[in-house]
A protein has these predicted regions:
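Residue-identity detector for glycine
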Residues: 12, 17-18, 29, 45, ...
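Short, hydrophobic/aromatic-rich segments at coil-to-beta transitions
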Residues: 94-101, 117-125
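Short, surface-exposed coil-to-beta transition loops
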Residues: 58-60, 107-110, 132-137
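A short, structured loop/turn motif at beta-sheet edges
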Residues: 69, 114-118, 140-148
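Hydrophobic pocket/interface hotspot
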Residues: 71-76, 82, 100, 113, ...
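Beta-strand/loop substructures that line and gate deep hydrophobic ligand-binding cavities in soluble
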Residues: 125-184
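Hydrophobic ligand-binding cavity/cleft-lining segments
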Residues: 38, 42-93
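Low-acidity, Ser/Thr- and Arg-rich intrinsically disordered low-complexity segments
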Residues: 2-11, 16, 21, 25
Length: 184
């Protein structure tokens, strides 16, 4: 669903094979009432969350943008801007009956951002034709002289290593494009 590039700082999935991991009983800063079955594993910037027998692998991709975080958030949070910076997701975005739809290379999906907020949270949800909902964590973080956009690519069930890497590379390309658009 995304296209490819190399300018984003990536802490990508290590090559297939053995992975050295350490496990903590709960995530840093977890609240006391968090379910005990939640476990986090950290390895080379990659997270694996075990939750009730299900495992989700994540790859955090970031791009530094020389623009204030509120400007980056304002631009990136408008679904109509997606084709300009995230054509890997889709080149056509349409609003219908208060909902946003994007035509991906494989199908038309419903797209929704988390409610507007002052924290830079740009999490979004893609609802596939099958009814499956894909949660995509994304943040715009302010720093001293600009911002950093962090996008979490999550491995979906059945996704091969090559597909997972291609998805991450495509996100990196889109974040690099977002940087170019906003720094022009």
């Amino acid at each position: 669903m995304w296209t490819s590039a190399a300018s984003a700082r990536m802490r990508g999935p290590p090559a297939s094979g053995g992975i050295q991991c350490t496990e903590a009983s709960t995530a840093p800063g977890a609240v006391a009432d968090e379910p005990e079955h939640v476990r986090f594993v950290q390895s080379w910037g990659r997270s694996i969350q075990h939750d009730g027998g299900m495992t989700s692998e994540s790859w955090h991709i970031s791009e530094r943008i020389d623009r204030p975080a509120d400007e980056v958030y304002a631009y990136a949070s408008i679904p109509a801007n997606l084709p300009r910076w995230a054509p890997g997701l889709g080149n056509s975005v349409e609003e219908a009956d208060g909902q946003w739809f994007v035509d991906t290379p494989t199908e038309r999906v419903r797209f929704a951002f988390a409610p507007r907020n002052d924290l830079g949270v740009l999490d979004h949800y893609l609802t596939l034709n099958s009814g499956e909902v894909i949660y995509v964590p994304m943040r715009v973080i302010a720093d001293e002289s600009g911002s950093e956009v962090v996008f979490t690519v999550r491995r979906r069930p059945g996704m091969t290593d090559d597909e997972f890497k291609a998805d991450g590379d495509a996100v990196a390309a889109d974040l690099a494009r977002l940087k170019r658009v906003l720094e022009e």
